[in-house]
Amino acid sequence: MAELTVEVRGSNGAFYKGFIKDVHEDSLTVVFENNWQPERQVPFNEVRLPPPPDIKKEISEGDEVEVYSRANDQEPCGWWLAKVRMMKGEFYVIEYAACDATYNEIVTFERLRPVNQNKTVKKNTFFKCTVDVPEDLREACANENAHKDFKKAVGACRIFYHPETTQLMILSASEATVKRVNILSDMHLRSIRTKLMLMSRNEEATKHLECTKQLAAAFHEEFVVREDLMGLAIGTHGSNIQQARKVPGVTAIELDEDTGTFRIYGESADAVKKARGFLEFVEDFIQVPRNLVGKVIGKNGKVIQEIVDKSGVVRVRIEGDNENKLPREDGMVPFVFVGTKESIGNVQVLLEYHIAYLKEVEQLRMERLQIDEQLRQIGSRSYSGRGRGRRGPNYTSGYGTNSELSNPSETESERKDELSDWSLAGEDDRDSRHQRDSRRRPGGRGRSVSGGRGRGGPRGGKSSISSVLKDPDSNPYSLLDNTESDQTADTDASESHHSTNRRRRSRRRRTDEDAVLMDGMTESDTASVNENGLVTVADYISRAESQSRQRNLPRETLAKNKKEMAKDVIEEHGPSEKAINGPTSASGDDISKLQRTPGEEKINTLKEENTQEAAVLNGVS
């Protein structure tokens, strides 16, 4: 700015040093030295150029000179007009011309100079031209050092950037400068742009060098991402990289797009590892049993979608049977997942847990099926045995335990109580109960409609006691296998029918596993066997009679009730006796009378003597 130095006349007539900042039509914008006055516009007639620096200083007595001095301590020094009165060596006595009163002062030679002969400036004293600056170069043009060479080339007094007009201002005292500016301005701007680019690259290289030196001793990790997963790793508009760079402690992240290599530098291992978690995308697969694929996917994909959402994986794919990209195991289907390493670990945990749960549920289901199959097998044997028909939910084994078999007195007592209730009940009650029994009786439990008591339906007269009496030499096993009446001795129609009704109300069920032939043996601790080694019907009745005689309960209290009950039962069921007990023809009765044995005669005698007892005891099963 020394070349644009001017002298501005103050109000006291002295000239003060200043600098031109801008040129206007009729004034100059001047900045004063040391800013002792604010910047202001000064008219041309109050501004002059300083004298040349190489002027010869020849001063003698009586010459007019200019003295560099100040009026007071608050003002800076300026050039005052004076006159030399006396000279003595290096000292000069001067007299100020601006003061009314004579004011003398002794000064040295350095503070004196000849009177400035330059006139005040005019409009054509200074020339100004402007150059528009592109937006990308405005910041660079604000530095005046960038125009040093250009200023020298064009001969300008001053070159500066004006931010309000975004123009480059060139001030000069020569008109030739304007022409040179028009020639060199474009070249100057290109050179600024080139230098700016080179400077920027140099700065980046310097920063990279410094960063590399710092990172050499810091933590860093390097990993490769597959090319088809590079888009996921970078993220939308580089969001993943930006997120990784925001991790506290991460200093730099570098990406080699050609090889897909990421390099992460940080101040700590944890920071580098955390940043890597945002960028490292991988693809992995999990084997799922083929029979569980549908349950893993769920209805409308609900289960697999929940697993994907909770784990954070990007996508999932099920490899088809015709694809052989991944290794397969027998009975397994690969599920392929894509995501960060953390999300892949999460989905592996979720899927393995769900598969283990499904396997456990399947195992429990199979165990239940096995149990149900065993129950069906057991139930099929129970249902098909002896023509008993189906049992209700409260069914228990009719034979009971060994203790029940060895103590028949308990069931005998229960039967007596039932008979007592029958005898004491009114006629209406008995009639209604008879109607209910008659509705249940025709089919019976596991019996045919005709009243036959054998398994699988009626067998005619062969299932009755009369058939046995007709043929004493026949095999008694057939009777025990095919009827339920082998536990009783039905000697006549009334007695058999009466005992049948009682057995329906209270009798102990037999299991299908009990031996039919030994049923008669278990009714008494001392079973009698005839000379052929077989148990006959007469022996069975004899045992029942002997057991009844051993009972300790008093029979007198129930004798009357038993007689009435037996009589009522015989009268009520008289018409159906023939149908129940077997053959109804007279020829059949005659044959049975002719073929009676001494054992059967004994049975009839016992029946007549103990009619009431036989009605109760012969029904024990």
From Swiss-Prot:
Residue positions, PTM Omega-N-methylarginine: 447, 453, 455
Species this chain originates from: Homo sapiens (Human)
Tissue expression per record: Expressed in all tissues examined including heart, brain, kidney and testis. In brain, present at high level in neurons and especially in the Purkinje cells at the interface between the granular layer and the molecular layer (at protein level).
Entry-annotated residues carrying Asymmetric dimethylarginine: 447, 453, 455
Protein name from the UniProt record: RNA-binding protein FXR1
Effect listed in the UniProt record for changing residue 233 to T: In a breast cancer sample; somatic mutation
Protein task: mRNA-binding protein that acts as a regulator of mRNAs translation and/or stability, and which is required for various processes, such as neurogenesis, muscle development and spermatogenesis. Specifically binds to AU-rich elements (AREs) in the 3'-UTR of target mRNAs. Promotes formation of some phase-separated membraneless compartment by undergoing liquid-liquid phase separation upon binding to AREs-containing mRNAs, leading to assemble mRNAs into cytoplasmic ribonucleoprotein granules that concentrate mRNAs with associated regulatory factors.
Keywords in alphabetical order: Acetylation, Cell projection, Cytoplasm, Developmental protein, Differentiation, Isopeptide bond, Methylation, Myogenesis, Nucleus, Phosphoprotein, Repeat, RNA-binding, Spermatogenesis, Synapse, Ubl conjugation
